[in-house]
């Protein structure tokens, strides 16, 4: 249990970096950032895939199709929506919307996967969800009070919608990915991360070319193919690809095999906490008291959720009888 939580913590620390990436290169469209990140990931995965080609051959066609669906929803579409939301609403607000994942995932895990992983009684789960929900509200209120430069309701609202879409994408990814890993305990998490990175390569390459064509027609002054700050953009995409997409996904895959889905869900809060930490470091300011109170409630909620013990899976009970 402890090792699984530590792996989830490390994944959250890595994933938190994605909230500051769009702020470093705000002049780059979200489409270019999303495709650039996963194009870098796919290229990095090529030599690793060659070294692990024996394990990759063990995957069936349906496994590769699952990897493709996962990478489309949990990588490309998710990051495109998130980067767009961050540029429209600011990093803290988008971070807190993504922060609803610790509430969304365990609820759906309890509804969908209780027969396999064991059901966590709603009476045990409710205090954790309430703490997390109040904590998220506190941080969100604090950030809205902080204000946004050049505020535009239409742009802000569209950013909220895009952030909500990214929540749906990642919730589906987390549940479906954990389900595959739990159903395939003989498959190494690194092999599965490599497979997802590989199928990302052709999709992201096509997407990057489409983004360049669109920019060339809509914004002819935009320098192509790597924008006005090519060295910064390429370095940032490679760093995010390695730390967030590779190391983060690997750690999360290990945690997914070690922990029940209903407990794994609340641990997504580590990503939210890391994103807030990095954002305030970038701002070079201390978070306000309400934000700190919200963070404390988030941590308390996670501790309550992790300490709760799921009931025995129904499948095991049937097999034993």
UniProtKB/Swiss-Prot annotation:
Q: Does the keyword Cell inner membrane apply?
A: yes
Q: Where is the EamA domain?
A: 13-141
Q: What membrane topology is annotated for this entry?
A: Multi-pass membrane protein
Q: Which residues lie on this side of the membrane: Periplasmic?
A: 26-30, 87-92, 142-154, 216-230, 283-285
Query: Does the record's keyword annotation contain Cell inner membrane?
Result: yes
Concerning Pfam families, the annotation shows: EamA (PF00892)
Q: What are its GO cellular component terms?
A: plasma membrane
**Name by which UniProt lists this protein:** Inner membrane protein YtfF
Q: Which gene encodes it?
A: ytfF
């Amino acid at each position: 249990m402890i090792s699984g939580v530590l792996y989830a913590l490390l994944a959250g620390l890595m994933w938190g970096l994605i909230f500051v990436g769009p702020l470093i290169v705000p002049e780059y469209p979200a489409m270019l950032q999303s495709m650039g990140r996963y194009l870098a990931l796919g290229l990095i995965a090529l030599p690793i895939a060659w070294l692990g080609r024996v394990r990759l051959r063990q995957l069936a066609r349906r496994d590769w199709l699952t990897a493709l669906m996962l990478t489309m929803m949990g990588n490309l579409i998710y990051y495109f929506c998130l980067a767009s939301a961050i540029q429209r609403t600011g990093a803290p607000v988008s971070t807190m919307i993504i922060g609803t994942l610790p509430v969304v995932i365990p609820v759906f895990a309890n509804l969908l996967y209780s027969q396999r992983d064991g059901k966590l009684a709603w009476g045990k789960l409710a205090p954790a969800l309430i703490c997390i929900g109040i904590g998220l509200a506190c941080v969100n209120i604090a950030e809205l009070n902080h204000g946004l430069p050049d505020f535009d309701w239409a742009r802000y609202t569209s950013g909220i919608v895009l952030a909500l879409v990214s929540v749906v994408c990642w919730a589906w990814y987390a549940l479906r990915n954990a389900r595959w890993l739990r159903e395939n305990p003989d498959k190494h998490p690194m092999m599965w991360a490599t497979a997802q990175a590989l199928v990302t390569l052709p999709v992201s390459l096509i997407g990057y070319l489409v983004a360049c064509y669109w920019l060339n027609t809509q914004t002819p002054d935009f320098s192509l193919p790597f924008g006005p700050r090519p060295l910064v953009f390429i370095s940032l995409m490679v760093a995010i690809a390695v730390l967030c997409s590779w190391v983060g996904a690997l750690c999360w895959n290990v945690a997914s095999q070690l922990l029940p889905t209903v407990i794994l869900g609340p641990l997504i809060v580590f990503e939210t906490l890391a994103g807030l930490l990095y954002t305030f470091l970038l701002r070079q300011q201390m978070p306000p008291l309400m934000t700190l109170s919200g963070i404390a409630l988030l941590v308390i909620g996670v501790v309550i959720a992790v300490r709760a013990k799921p009931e025995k899976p129904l499948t095991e009970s049937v097999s034993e009888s």
